[in-house]
Amino acid sequence: MSLKLKITAITPYPVWVGIRNQFLLKIETDQGIVGWGESGLSGREKAVAGAIEHYTKFLIGQDAMQIGRIWQEMYRSQYFEGGRVLQAAISAIDIALHDIKGKALGVPVYELLGGKQRDVVPAFASTGDAAGEGAVERAHELRAMGFDAIRFFPIGQDSRDIFEPRQSIAATARILNRAREELGSEVVLGIDYHHRLSVAEAASFCNKLDKGVLDFLEEPIRDETPEAYESLRTMTDIPFAIGEEFSSKWQFIPYIERGIHQFNRLDVCNVGGLTEAMKVAGWSEAHYVDLMPHNPLGPICTAATVHFAAAVPNFAWLETRAPETALGFDNSEFFPVQPKLEGAVYPVSDAPGLGVEVNEALLAKQSFKFWEAPHLKRTDGSVTNW
């Protein structure tokens, strides 16, 4: 006998939690089972809320258990399909539907994705706001906490106004060379340049590093043109970590099939939810690309990604913050039950659904605050990437 749960309400909560807004979504059903999702398009929450309003018009009354069909209807039932705003909305809805289905069947979400392939999910941590020589000291602290994969940020990353790439790459290369010398060869070291470099600047940066210093270089340049990454690929043998901004399996095609990147940074809250993430994971597995999911948001995103990571074979590390409370996104007053690090790993929850509890009454009291990412300029006054 089939189990049907009719969608009765969809409520977005774009609210301030920690240092930024979180876009949370609640879906209710006629049998009292609710699900929670999260969108990853930080800074454009109002746009996502508008898309959710459009989808709500035809989702009310549908069977929440038919996740794949609903995904296809949201994506295909319009002429101007896809794009980051719509996919961020689809992601939140898709994650919430998985939460509902898991609760309805009494199983954790990973069971809906094929079952658990690992008991714990290894994580990598970042040096955070620590700058310059302080980043190396922070890396030592992370090692002492048990992390064997550590990500650095470039010199100038924390600037709110000026970022000069050429100045950054020289100083950052010196710091990374020192870090490798002090930390040894066992630890995995990477850096996220947040697509702030040109091909020439990225190549120059790689050439300033000693051999074997970096295990991955994340988002050195913008991703709109795969051929640009192919050009950079010929200039360095450092593995690339790319994909946190991608909003569909189609956007991953050239990167996976041309062997451009070695670590796939997909974001379940941007790519189209767990439904789309599993398709990207399979494609990546076929081309021996490891998964290294983007996870910069709140506990809903973390929980969904932990279930995803548990269910796929080709997994490397999950992004985390150490300590998790650093930015306030995991505020336990809002999320009394949520994934928690144990050392440098996330245990995989066996609770039905995502395994997250949300204090909706407190959430409803919070307001939305407009937040804008820094608008960076070079020293000559020209605009550059954040």
What does each of the following model-derived ranges do?
Residues 2-19, 30, 93, 299-386:
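Flexible C-terminal active-site loop/helix
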Residues 7, 32, 55, 93, ...:
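Conserved, mostly hydrophobic/aromatic
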Residues 94-130, 134:
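Glycine-rich, aromatic-flanked loop segments that form ligand/cofactor-binding clefts
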Residues 39, 125-129, 152-154, 191-195, ...:
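A cross-domain feature marking catalytic cores of carbohydrate-active enzymes
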Residues 27, 50-57, 69, 213, ...:
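Shared catalytic-loop signature of beta/alpha-barrel
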Residues 30-105, 386:
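Metal- or metallocofactor-binding catalytic centers and their adjacent structured scaffolds
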Residues 120-236:
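Metal-dependent enolase-superfamily TIM-barrel catalytic cores that perform enediolate-based chemistry
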